[in-house]
Curated annotation (Swiss-Prot):
Gene: Rtn4rl2
Origin organism lineage: Eukaryota, Metazoa, Chordata, Craniata, Vertebrata
Domain of life of the native organism: Eukaryota
Propeptide residues according to the Swiss-Prot or TrEMBL record: 399-420
Subunit structure comment from the entry: Interaction with MAG is controversial, and may be indirect. Interacts with MAG. Does not interact with OMG and RTN4.
Chain residues carrying a lipid of type GPI-anchor amidated glycine: G398
Domain LRRCT: 261-312
Keyword annotations: Cell membrane, Cell projection, Disulfide bond, Glycoprotein, GPI-anchor, Leucine-rich repeat, Lipoprotein, Membrane, Receptor, Repeat, Signal
Name of the molecule in the record: Reticulon-4 receptor-like 2
């Protein structure tokens, strides 16, 4: 052994050297070319690099992977490591997601596949195994339909973004496993009808956005079970009528938007008008389109005398629901020729005259309060690494020197200078 090295290993220097060796990090795969990597939490950002496929050399410890704004066309099984918590793939050219791609990502909490204009269909088991997934983004694709069991097993999901697709129909029980879902965004599609069990299972839903569709009918039981819903948007559709029974199933409703629909303020409007007389909600205008003598009036401001010429209402027991042999037009709030609308009065007789859902000791919340924490998809930008946990210099191309390694290196510096 060299004399200089023997002297270095004697005395206090040996402890300092041992501390240095213990602090050395284990060998890990390098950061993929053109990407930026951070060590805490393990993050790889490869956004906006014109990648046509996912990089092959991703560190297996990666927890957050940002691949947005590339040209990636397909995803295959085995591409992603099992430690992923966040995966952003929005604004690519995705057209195919092979079965099993996400099956082993059991820790994944957020998956963003939005703004992929070539993604026209999904396999039924695309999201199988994602039991911890909390946020799923499928907005602004070209999806025209969804398999009936596409969301099966997503028991932790809280946010589901399906807006601005080409969805024509939603199957009954499509969301049946999503007991924890609080936000469902379906606006900007081509939906024409809401069936009886389309939202069954969504007992925790707080916000439901259905504006900008082509809705012509809503089943009287479509919202049954949505006992926590506070925000409902149905504006900018093709609704001429809406069953009052449907809204009576929403005891927590606070904000309702029905504007920009061709409301028929004839006998068909009576159930909805009766609901407004008892409900305590913040609502948009409900402007009459027909008949001509009521055009431009607000449906909510009509009087009981406006419905005196209507046929006598049919008695309905509180809590009763129509069976399969009932008229489909009646169930969806569309009056048949010569058929009287159902009497809504018994549905509201037990509602309190005053709103008992206001906050104690303060003013009622405004709609802005409810949306204050929500940033639209267009506002997400191209954030490289969200959160303060992974701030690093812009030119960083690898993990920063750990604090545990700095101390022993500093203690070796004087020794090295002494033996030069």
């Amino acid at each position: 052994m060299l004399p200089g090295l023997r002297r270095l290993l004697q005395g206090p220097a040996s402890a300092c050297l041992l501390l240095t060796l213990l602090a050395l990090p284990s060998v890990t795969p390098s950061c993929p070319m053109l990407c930026t990597c951070y060590s805490s939490p393990p993050t790889v950002s490869c956004q906006a690099n014109n990648f046509s496929s996912v990089p092959l050399s991703l560190p297996p410890s990666t927890q957050r992977l940002f691949l947005q704004n590339n040209l990636i066309r397909s995803l295959r099984p085995g591409t992603f490591g099992p430690n992923l918590l966040t995966l952003w793939l929005f604004s690519n050219n995705l057209s195919t997601i092979h079965p099993g791609t996400f099956r082993h990502l059991q820790a994944l909490e957020e998956l963003d596949l939005g703004d992929n204009r070539h993604l026209r269909s999904l396999e039924p088991d695309t999201f199988q195994g994602l039991e911890r997934l909390q946020s799923l983004h499928l907005y602004r694709c070209q999806l025209s339909s969804l398999p009936g069991n596409i969301f099966r097993g997503l028991v932790s999901l809280q946010y589901l973004y399906l807006q601005e697709n080409s969805l024509l129909h939603l199957q009954d029980d499509l969301f049946a496993d999503l007991a924890n879902l609080s936000h469902l965004f379906l606006h900007g599609n081509r939906l024409r009808l809401l069936t009886e069990h389309v939202f069954r299972g969504l007992g925790s839903l707080d916000r439901l956005l259905l504006h900008g569709n082509r809705l012509q009918g809503v089943h009287r039981a479509a919202f049954h079970g949505l006992s926590r819903l506070t925000i409902l948007y149905l504006f900018n559709n093709s609704l001429a009528s809406l069953p009052g029974e449907a809204l009576a199933d929403l005891p927590a409703l606070e904000f309702l938007r029905l504007n920009a629909n061709p409301w028929a303020c004839d006998c068909r409007a009576r159930p909805l008008w009766a609901w407004f007389q008892r409900a305590r909600v913040s609502s948009s205008d409900v402007t009459c389109a027909t008949p001509p003598e009521r055009q431009g009036r607000d449906l909510r401001a009509l009087r009981d005398s406006d419905f005196q010429a209507c046929p006598p209402p049919t008695p309905t027991r509180p809590g009763s629901r129509a069976r399969g042999n009932s008229s489909s037009n009646h169930l969806y709030g569309v009056a048949e020729a010569g058929a009287p609308p159902a009497d809504p009065s018994t549905l509201y007789r037990d509602l309190p005259a005053e709103d008992s859902r206001g906050r104690q000791g303060g003013d009622a919340p405004t709609e802005d309060d409810y949306w204050g924490g929500y940033g639209g998809e267009d506002q997400r930008g191209e954030q490289t690494c969200p959160g303060a946990a992974c701030q690093a210099p812009a030119d960083s191309r690898g993990p920063a020197l750990s604090a545990g390694l700095r101390t022993p290196l500093l203690c070796l510096l004087p020794l090295a200078l002494h033996h030069l």
